[in-house]
Amino acid sequence: TLNWEQVIEITPILYDSMDRLKRMKESNRFNISVLTHVNSVPEIVEKVKFIRKYFDDITIIACPKELSKTKMVHAKDAILIDDYSENLREWKAAGGIPVKFSPTKKTTEFLCVDRIDQVLDIL
């Protein structure tokens, strides 16, 4: 069985994203929530524990992997920053604003960022 605590703790991009998310929150330009696909209860437990180390006032929405993120929240006019293109296509189809997170920034289909706080500069 996968040790989600270990996976989250050894993923440096998550730590950087928390710093970037803090910058976005401090801008007061966005109503920020974390919408995350999960495969299991242990995974969401570890994700929540990790996020709560940095933020006690951000809403965390766990979406079962079998459901579209558009079924969990109202996407219309909302921004989704995601690394998975299919999530972004569904988000756009539901009237949302898709932004691709990609360290390589190789996409022409979506606005693309390699740091989540870059949305402050492009939106």
Segments (PLM) and residue ranges:
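Substrate-recognition "cap/lid" segment bordering the active-site pocket of phosphatases
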Residues: 35-78, 85-88
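Short coil/turn segments at beta-strand junctions that form active-site/ligand-binding loops
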Residues: 28-31, 75-78, 96
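Structural recognition of alpha->loop->beta junctions
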Residues: 50-62, 109-123
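Glycine-centered loop/turn motif at secondary-structure junctions
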Residues: 28-29, 55, 95, 102
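Acidic, Mg2+-coordinating phosphoryl-transfer loop and its flanking beta/alpha structural elements
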Residues: 79-116
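Short, acidic loop-to-helix structural element flanking the phosphoryl-transfer center
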Residues: 2-33, 42-45
